[in-house]
Amino acid sequence: MAPKADKKPAAKKPAEEEPATEKAEKAPAGKKPKAEKRLPAGKSAGKEGGEGKKGKKKAKKSVETYKIYIFKVLKQVHPDIGISSKAMSIMNSFINDIFEKLAAESAKLARYNKKPTVTSREIQTSVRLVLPGELAKHAVSEGTKAVTKFTSS
């Protein structure tokens, strides 16, 4: 702390010659270089460049997960059971993997039939191809129910 005390009087002498606002700026500048690096992203974006702040918010929003929905289903099935963050991450990866497999299979089916659009029929067929046995039957029935509910509303 002694070296900091030595620096302050040196900073005060030029500050006494200059306006008091520079004195306030010089003292925190020596103390908070890390804080200044962190804060301008929030402060300068809010005051001057709103685009920088919005850009960062958009980057955070682009990360989409199924964590909320996994948790809701867990609470419907087992209200008294929780889930760790690692298990949640594994479940999220699992759902993303299944989604990618279904999307790829649906796209192949549309290409084979020379159709430009992936419809519910391609999705249903890809579910039957990707998922095994009883799981495929349940998935098809739930999917059909969801599509019916969507079209009726």
From Swiss-Prot:
Cross-link for Glycyl lysine isopeptide (Lys-Gly) (interchain with G-Cter in ubiquitin), residue positions: K149
Molecular function as annotated in GO: DNA binding; protein heterodimerization activity; structural constituent of chromatin
UniProt xrefs under Gene3D superfamilies: Histone, subunit A
Taxonomy, superkingdom: Eukaryota
GO cellular component: nucleosome; nucleus
Compartment(s) where it occurs, according to its Swiss-Prot or TrEMBL record: Nucleus; Chromosome
InterPro entries given in the database record: Histone-fold, Histone_H2A/H2B/H3, Histone_H2B, HISTONE_H2B_site
Post-translational events: Can be acetylated to form H2BK6ac and H2BK33ac. Monoubiquitinated to form H2BK143ub1; may give a specific tag for epigenetic transcriptional activation.
Residue numbers spanned by region Disordered: 1-60
Composition skew (Basic and acidic residues), residue ranges: 1-28
Keywords: Acetylation, Chromosome, DNA-binding, Isopeptide bond, Nucleosome core, Nucleus, Ubl conjugation
Main localization, broad class: nucleus
Modification N6-acetyllysine occurs at: K7, K37
Functional description taken from the UniProt entry: Core component of nucleosome. Nucleosomes wrap and compact DNA into chromatin, limiting DNA accessibility to the cellular machineries which require DNA as a template. Histones thereby play a central role in transcription regulation, DNA repair, DNA replication and chromosomal stability. DNA accessibility is regulated via a complex set of post-translational modifications of histones, also called histone code, and nucleosome remodeling.
PANTHER family according to UniProt: HISTONE H2B
Quaternary assembly: The nucleosome is a histone octamer containing two molecules each of H2A, H2B, H3 and H4 assembled in one H3-H4 heterotetramer and two H2A-H2B heterodimers. The octamer wraps approximately 147 bp of DNA.
Family from the record: Belongs to the histone H2B family.
Name of this protein: Histone H2B.3
